[in-house]
């Protein structure tokens, strides 16, 4: 037997990979330790080169070829904390919506997009060379009856030229502290053709995509301001350079010319994803276009007043913008409020139930894990949902938000008010299928059915100390009267026949004296047995 030092013990941690990816995603949302900034069409995304190179062949070639991995930013030094000194990539050939969806996929292993944006995501995945996303998008488009778009030759050529130019610039080996590599001009992008509108299909999709309320890690560019004095060429070059001080490697600030000076780097705000929100309000300022300084403002005709008049892709893009980052001085009357609901279903990995709605899958998973994160501060009762806790708090505060419009009654729940309204309207929607008696409340009908009040026959009142009547077995019992019609109000006839049937089946013998007041249909001293009635008639 070997010594304890020679014995190797393997302790597996199955959740380590998912927890590690979750921590990286949290760092991306907060902007911590990000060593790369991706710019596209006026928007910026803070991210990590290692994560992108692990899931995209294009980024792997971009970061490793020509520079041996020591390219674009201070990835090997400790000065890239919080995004300071990070490298910059200009990827204008990839749209912001598709790029945001692919970045979220890289950090969460879940592709979140809309049906209308699926062709754009497929095109971006082809440019960035992400095979698994390409296969998934092709399968969904084919299953939905949509034709997959062919690759855009212009965008493919621009992506190839950018990769070659970047590899050439980083291979030149510019030392730290010197001027940045020569800017390699790229051909201007062609005017975008009119985008075809994808037809929505009613066929079921083969894959379940998670939909979240908002995209995280969107950085809204600041509003461009006119400086007090014109900037010289050197000042513009210094202002547009990122990571020139801090021990960065060669090729730190390489970016194709965009025609305008880059906005100064500063602290950026991030919007973490809140899974409990079922829907959220999107505030959009008409005077600022898509984003502050991100593009020309839209005309009132393009904005419109009807929600259907706005492109759903535009609404999905606006969902990534937080209202705190948009024009803080605007009044509420100048803001356009939009609500976006989830479209893609999600499947529970435990019970395989299909969950609809953003953020509802984590709430459903609490039914399997038993987690109850919402606790009452008064009595300590815990709940799995926040809305249930709010309803519970009404018991402590005495709040009754549902009031009757016809009387001063107030109720704790909406269904109590609905049942109460039947008293004013006279509706009796709950009907017994045996006697067709209607009730205003469902619990009244259930009580009626459990007690069998509709078929119960009482020939006379019986005291507690009376012996129960003797019922003969079914073999010796007399045949029940045939030909009874229980329809058209013949229920009383059936009850009378049933009473006579039990009287004939009862054993003969002296009647049991029942002291007390007589029945309502009997007179004082009246006979109570058939023998007595016959004796009186004969006399």
Swiss-Prot record:
InterPro entries: BTB/POZ_dom, SKP1/BTB/POZ_sf, Znf_C2H2_sf, Znf_C2H2_type, ZnFinger_BTB_dom_contain. Acetylated directly and specifically by EP300. EP300-mediated acetylation of Lys-206, Lys-212 and Lys-335 stabilizes the protein by antagonizing ubiquitin conjugation. The keyword DNA-binding applies. Keywords: Acetylation, Developmental protein, Differentiation, DNA-binding, Isopeptide bond, Metal-binding, Nucleus, Phosphoprotein, Repeat, Repressor, Transcription, Transcription regulation, Ubl conjugation, Zinc, Zinc-finger. Residues 171-308, 458-486, 501-539 are annotated as: Disordered. CDD domains: BTB_POZ_ZBTB7B_ZBTB15 (cd18327). GO terms for biological process: adaptive thermogenesis; ectoderm development; lactation; negative regulation of CD8-positive, alpha-beta T cell differentiation; negative regulation of gene expression; negative regulation of NK T cell proliferation; negative regulation of T-helper 17 cell differentiation; negative regulation of transcription by RNA polymerase II. The keyword Transferase does not apply. Residues 344-400 are annotated as: Required for interaction with and acetylation by EP300. Homodimerizes. Interacts with NCL, NEDD4 and YBX1. Interacts with HNRNPU (via RNA-binding RGG-box region); the interaction facilitates the recruitment of long non-coding RNA Blnc1 by ZBTB7B. Interacts with HDAC4 and HDAC5; the interaction allows the recruitment of HDAC4 and HDAC5 on CD8 loci for deacetylation and possible inhibition of CD8 genes expression. PANTHER family: AGAP004733-PA, ZINC FINGER AND BTB DOMAIN-CONTAINING PROTEIN 7B. This is Zinc finger and BTB domain-containing protein 7B. It comes from Homo sapiens.
